[in-house]
Amino acid sequence: MRTTPTFPTKTFKPTAMALAVATTLSACLGGGGGGTSAPDFNAGGTGIGSNSRATTAKSAAVSYAGIKNEMCKDRSMLCAGRDDVAVTDRDAKINRPPPPNLHTGDFPNPNDAYKNLINLKPAIEAGYTGRGVEVGIVDTGESVGSISFPELYGRKEHGYNENYKNYTAYMRKEAPEDGGGKDIEASFDDEAVIETEAKPTDIRHVKEIGHIDLVSHIIGGRSVDGRPAGGIAPDATLHIMNTNDGTKNEMMVAAIRNAWVKLGERGVRIVNNSFGTTSRAGTADLFQIANSEEQYRQALLDYSGGDKTDEGIRLMQQSDYGNLSYHIRNKNMLFIFSTGNDAQAQPNTYALLPFYEKDAQKGIITVAGVDRSGEKFKREMYGEPGTEPLEYGSNHCGITAMWCLSAPYEASVRFTRTNPIQIAGTSFSAPIVTGTAALLLQKYPWMSNDNLRTTLLTTAQDIGAVGVDSKFGWGLLDAGKAMNGPASFPFGDFTADTKGTSDIAYSFRNDISGTGGLIKKGGSQLQLHGNNTYTGKTIIEGGSLVLYGNNKSDMRVETKGALIYNGAASGGSLNSDGIVYLADTDQSGANETVHIKGSLQLDGKGTLYTRLGKLLKVDGTAIIGGKLYMSARGKGAGYLNSTGRRVPFLSAAKIGQDYSFFTNIETDGGLLASLDSVEKTAGSEGDTLSYYVRRGNAARTASAAAHSAPAGLKHAVEQGGSNLENLMVELDASESSATPETVETAAADRTDMPGIRPYGATFRAAAAVQHANAADGVRIFNSLAATVYADSTAAHADMQGRRLKAVSDGLDHNGTGLRVIAQTQQDGGTWEQGGVEGKMRGSTQTVGIAAKTGENTTAAATLGMGRSTWSENSANAKTDSISLFAGIRHDAGDIGYLKGLFSYGRYKNSISRSTGADEHAEGSVNGTLMQLGALGGVNVPFAATGDLTVEGGLRYDLLKQDAFAEKGSALGWSGNSLTEGTLVGLAGLKLSQPLSDKAVLFATAGVERDLNGRDYTVTGGFTGATAATGKTGARNMPHTRLVAGLGADVEFGNGWNGLARYSYAGSKQYGNHSGRVGVGYRF
């Protein structure tokens, strides 16, 4: 037996002539018929428009002529195994306006128009290209030379020998970046592997483009050199089974059968079959086939025109169909067939297997062709001159309607050094579906053939009349919608075996209807985002199923399964021997209800995970058993006071067993929530289980947490806990603070609740801390101490001291005359204390003058502008300042000197930090810093030309800071004004050594000590409080700091001079490095 590819020509010749014929036939006729993306045969119709999705609306049942209800029995092709529904007649029509343009995507190139028709763009934009998916193509055509097409690099091609049994692989690798092209001459009998050596832009190839090349390009052709017309799945691996019998236009059945075997052996899951046996039954109405199997077999043979001998029956039904059935059942393969181009009411015979064998339906999809208005193509091709025109166009889905959909009949491909080739025929409708199936398998690699065909069929766009009918099948392929999973379960239960680990999640985002159910297997997670109305049961045997919306189905959770309700959701009855999880992953804070519209049974082996504020509402009876895990994490439970209250977590019309039947109860109170006991209450509306909860003492909790904190944070953690406890004592005393309503009503600033109105945001922020993870206690309490204010102020004061010292050093080396100098100074360092590190950075630019004001007196003054930054933990500070520095030195002959120093600066400290559990606060504070210093030095001769000076003295720092209030959080800090004075002792050595009459080197070493310490902590309270007070934390600035430096002065001549300095100040915990360069002019 021989078959032909489904080109729209009577006798296919895969040559340039055949292509030319295909491109010249542009007339299309036809009408009526339609498909649907849902399995309801009495659903209302939808139009076809821009980015529209099929929807169903109930309407009166439609009578379908020619179909008897009893024929539905055991006829999966008609009724999907159901005996209570009918199928539209193949000629059924519905009065409706003409369908609009089907373009739903927006690929701009006209050669990609067929991709817009199937809404491909969402799939491409999501990054799906078919990578990692193996696709088989059983086809024919002159294609040995075409393996040098760069668009098809990576394609694996297999020919066959004369016995149609042994295939030789021709494997093309990626095109190398260098090397020229070469023609490849090989026979299909060669036992060799061919590797091309060609660049995508330098290809010499055969003149003829075969049918096999065109089909391959539609599925997996790559876009080369910027050309837009690539295939549907350009990264898929293509296995080409060339079954050419030597005539270039026909295929041997034995070769086809063996091709399927070889693809199955290679693990190929998706197979494109753009061929078929030409129908000779004309418009024979196979809907009238009687129920008996023998009559069907005879009608099938009559329809196919096959050989009626025993050998013909063996080849047609035992060999071909038996081969298909085996691979569908045992190899999990999906076979996609074209309907053919005879403009007949029935498709080619290869796709009829499910009519004969019901279970085969899960592995076969038949594809009809549609034009851009959604109707079938009818093409006219004229034969020899003087003959009547012969009509050719897409065959209808016919009796394969339940496993049939439609795809564009026309497409465009482009090979290197060719213009775009316009092609037409169901040969190219089928690979459009095949390519989409490859994208789908890339996204859901666990999908079975049944999963794939269910998803592709049920997401099709509804075109034409309503219902799965004999023209369009399920409707027009919608690739974008298919990538969101199935839209219906019409073929029985949908088994999702999501193989993998629990950290991998897959999502179905369509609303799912149908009479089937869902069986969840495998370790990975499956998420349902739609509002689902399917009526079959949902059984979770393994992994987790997450519901983001409503689910009408009754649920059963097995021991290795988990059901997660994310957010407010509802569903049917629930029976669980596994895990039922109600805690939110996003901790949104809403008082959400999971509504079970039926009964609840928690068996002894299962576990209920829930949290305070989440209510499990059961309309029927609740039978309680197993383990309860109650968490106080999240915000839903609201603020808890020290007295406590009941928080319900389960309500039912009746709780059939006492709550004590929870065999084990575990609780997670979070940071400050204490869960005391479970209580059962009965009311007019049913029974309720509640937990009695109260808050813990923040100061004691923080003190305990400080034991495990780094030494540098202990004080801040304890201070933050004390601040929070003071605040919660105030909240406890406010009106109605213990009720859940407090959070919502106070947030709305209701005038009828004046006692709590000022605390709306404060209750929410405090509640978030109460219910936070206990492991985050150190971080949270530290943030409530706001240490960044004191620490950044201390860092700024130290840097201003470094800048004043620079003025002091300049007095020692000014020389004679008036000197003007400009300098830039860069500071940086770290402050590590008890395992906690802070970082500082600073930059200052100064201009100033220095001059001899008398025979033994030198004076200097500079103006500086600077910016410094400080970062610690999750807080950052930026300090901008402007300061005046001045100094005077008086020499007492060669013995020594006296110095007076002064600085005054204003600063603005801008703070950004996290506070509490998950809030953010920002603030700014203004202040001034004045410094006064008095120093004396004694000169000691050193070597022949050098000088050594011993210097000592005192400096007084006076810091004044304004009051401030942070914004953005009720747990931000509202600080009082601050005044702090610090006396600093100074001592050091200075060494100067001239190198010449124009260059001098300097070295310094010394010590600074705060004689009375410095305390920049800020008293105040949280911005969300009205009475509670506290103070910020602070690092302990080292009282004693070592200082050292190196430098040089150079005279350039003509009055110009320059300087360079490096200095260090620090201790074991603290270090500040400073570099300074300047240039001056001496008058």
Swiss-Prot record:
Signal peptide: 1-27
Protein name: Neisserial autotransporter lipoprotein NalP
Transmembrane segments: 819-828, 844-852, 858-866, 883-891, 897-906, 931-941, 948-958, 984-994, 1000-1010, 1041-1052, 1057-1066, 1074-1083
Domain notes: The signal peptide, cleaved at the inner membrane, guides the autotransporter protein to the periplasmic space. Insertion of the C-terminal translocator domain in the outer membrane forms a hydrophilic pore for the translocation of the passenger domain to the bacterial cell surface, with subsequent lipid-anchoring to the cell outer membrane and eventual release of the passenger domain. The translocator domain (residues 777-1084) forms a 12-stranded beta-barrel with a 10 X 12.5 Angstrom channel with its N-terminal alpha helix (residues 786-817) inside the channel. The N-terminus of the N-terminal alpha helix points to the extracellular side. The isolated beta-barrel forms a pore able to import and export antibiotics; removal of the N-terminal alpha helix enhances transport.
Lipid positions (S-diacylglycerol cysteine): C28
Effect of disrupting the coding gene: Altered processing of autotransporter proteins IgA protease and App. No longer processes extracellular LbpB. Increased biofilm formation.
Domain Autotransporter positions: 809-1083
Factors inducing expression: The translocator domain alone accumulates during growth under iron-limiting conditions, cell-associated full-length protein accumulates later (at protein level).
Gene3D superfamilies in UniProt: Autotransporter beta-domain, Peptidase S8/S53 domain
Effect of S427A: Altered processing of secreted proteins App, IgA and LbpB in vivo, intact NalP accumulates on cell surface, a new processed form of NalP appears. Increased biofilm formation
Annotated GO MF terms: serine-type endopeptidase activity
Residues annotated as the enzyme's active site: D139 (charge relay system), H211 (charge relay system), S427 (charge relay system)
Function: Major human immunogenic protein. Autotransporter with a secreted protease domain involved in processing other autotransporter proteins including App and IgA. Probably autoprocesses to release the about 70 kDa passenger domain. Processes the lactoferrin receptor lipoprotein subunit (LbpB) extracellularly, releasing it from the cell surface. LbpB release protects bacteria against complement-mediated killing by anti-LbpB antibodies. Processes NHBA. Plays a role in extracellular-DNA (eDNA) mediated biofilm formation. In some strains (including cc32 strain H44/76 but not cc11 strain B16B6) eDNA stimulates biofilm formation. When NalP is not expressed (and no longer processes NHBA or IgA) biofilm formation increases. This is probably because the number of positively charged, DNA-binding peptides on the cell surface rises, resulting in increased biofilm formation.
Organism the protein comes from: Neisseria meningitidis serogroup B / serotype 15 (strain H44/76)
UniProt GO cellular component terms: cell outer membrane; cell surface; extracellular region; plasma membrane
PTM comment, free text: A fusion protein of the first 44 residues with beta-lactamase is lipidated in E.coli, strongly suggesting this is a lipoprotein in situ. The lipidated form is briefly retained on the cell surface which allows it to process its endogenous substrates on the cell surface before the passenger domain is released into the medium.
Pfam families xrefs: Autotransporter, PATR, Peptidase_S8
Family the entry assigns: Belongs to the peptidase S8 family.
Top-level taxon in the UniProt lineage: Bacteria
CDD domains: Peptidases_S8_Autotransporter_serine_protease_like (cd04848)
Keywords annotated in UniProt: Autocatalytic cleavage, Cell outer membrane, Hydrolase, Lipoprotein, Membrane, Palmitate, Protease, Secreted, Serine protease, Signal, Transmembrane, Transmembrane beta strand, Virulence
Residue ranges annotated for the Peptidase S8 domain, each copy included: 111-483
Phylogenetic lineage: Bacteria, Pseudomonadati, Pseudomonadota, Betaproteobacteria, Neisseriales
First-tier enzyme category under EC: hydrolase
EC number: 3.4.21.-
InterPro entries: Autotransporte_beta, Autotransporte_beta_dom_sf, Autotrns_rpt, Peptidase_S8/S53_dom, Peptidase_S8/S53_dom_sf, Peptidase_S8_Ser-AS, Peptidase_S8_subtilisin-rel, Peptidases_S8_Autotransporter
